[in-house]
Amino acid sequence: MKIIFAGTPDFAAVALRRLIEAGHDIVLVLSQPDRPSGRGMKLTPSPVKRLALDNGIPVLTPQTLSLKRAPEEAAAVHRQLCEANADLLVVAAYGLILPQVVLDCARGIGRNGDIRAINIHGSLLPRWRGAAPVARAIEAGDAESGVTLMKMELGLDTGPMVCEVRTPITDTDTGDTLMMRLADMGADLLVKALETPDELTWVPQPEEGVTYAEKLLKSEAVIDWTQPAEVIARKVRAFTPFPGTVFTKDDIPVKIWEAVPVEGSGQPGEVLDTHGALTIACGTGAVKATILQKPGKPRMPAPSFLQSLKFTVSEVVK
């Protein structure tokens, strides 16, 4: 099958690799422009762009696909997409808004021939439409997550559903581990669906149960110690690897990368124990932090971290 693929991060690269391995003809790839990365802030291509170039696939990296914002650039990309003569557009975490002309650029598959663009979305729609479905599911304490293959339309993840796959969210899942598990599941689901392209059908999303996964902000990283321990521990897991969770001790920002809720009571932010881990009181209960990080330093197990930065029982952190 001739496919145009649009995606940017590792989540999308997993699907692109699986499509290549399955023998599909990837005629063109869309990905976001190179971004500064690392300490040297060197321009770095996205995982999807690197994979495409490694496989000799042409890549387009427009700043926008909007004719209003960049009429010449967008029109040129629209023309290239239509001239690719693809059967299907596959989208996975691309990151740019796709206008209708892009959604209609492929010939289409499915029983009615009307599935021209299909999206790999990391949630069980209609729950967690939007930019950060994986992290928001963990943060909310959802028992399960999954991947939905969706026929794309202009609305924000509102398109009808082709198929889905589910997975439990474990007590140790982080945003990173769940994301990559869903990436594998979504890639498998897509490849299997494309084995019988003429049989694919879709159903509208349920009208009830709609929630939105807002984009993660750096400002959300700051821990509010008045919240329950269970909520804070979920945020630690959900916000790994981005934006992380942080508190301050003597004006030093400290990130927590692993923590579990435990019994304990005290003033919110009060240090309760420093033996083997850092236990801090919350609005209800306490969290025991087992992996922490200081600015400019690697993540460290709590015993080593507590040797490098001293905490006193009963002191209050912010």
Locate predicted features.
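One-carbon transfer enzymes
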Residues: 1-241, 294-296, 315-318
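An anion-binding loop in the catalytic cleft
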Residues: 220, 226-318
